[in-house]
């Protein structure tokens, strides 16, 4: 099962309870609705490796020894990150089971379900959320504004 993540970048996460968000992402990985627990042979993470939510997801997948695919939207993405985040991103790209150049549309097509960290505002995560709904993909929505799942 391929589970993608879409969520806000660091600049949009300021003011939100980041620890709570990370806990909810981990909860979604380990106890995703409809499954008892994740297992290495059945769970593949999918993300774009942006700063913020994407890197948190990759860290959690890595710590649970789960495979992941990275869909890189553009090569210069790391130029918009802190040096530390760019280094972490580079490490995760090197560890990915599959890495390819692709946009949100391809991630939505390739995933079975999605975890979305979204506060309800317009932007890239909103666009991805709309695509997931249109494709009738199951969505585990983590709202950092209201702290509602």
Locate each region found by the language model:
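Acidic/glycine-enriched connector segments
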Residues: 2-149
């Amino acid at each position: 099962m391929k589970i993608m993540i879409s969520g806000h970048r660091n600049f949009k996460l300021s003011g939100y309870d980041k620890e709570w968000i990370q806990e909810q992402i981990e909860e979604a990985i380990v106890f995703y609705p409809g499954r008892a627990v994740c297992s290495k042979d059945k769970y593949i993470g999918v993300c774009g490796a942006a700063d913020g939510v994407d890197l948190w997801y990759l860290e959690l997948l890595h710590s649970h020894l789960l495979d992941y695919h990275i869909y890189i939207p553009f090569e210069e993405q790391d130029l918009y990150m802190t040096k530390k985040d760019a280094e972490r991103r580079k490490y995760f790209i090197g560890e990915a089971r599959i890495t390819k150049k692709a946009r949100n549309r391809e991630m939505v097509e390739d995933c079975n379900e999605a975890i979305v960290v979204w506060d309800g505002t317009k932007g890239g995560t909103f666009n991805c959320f709309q695509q997931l709904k249109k494709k009738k993909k199951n969505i585990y929505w983590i709202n950092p504004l209201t702290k509602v799942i």
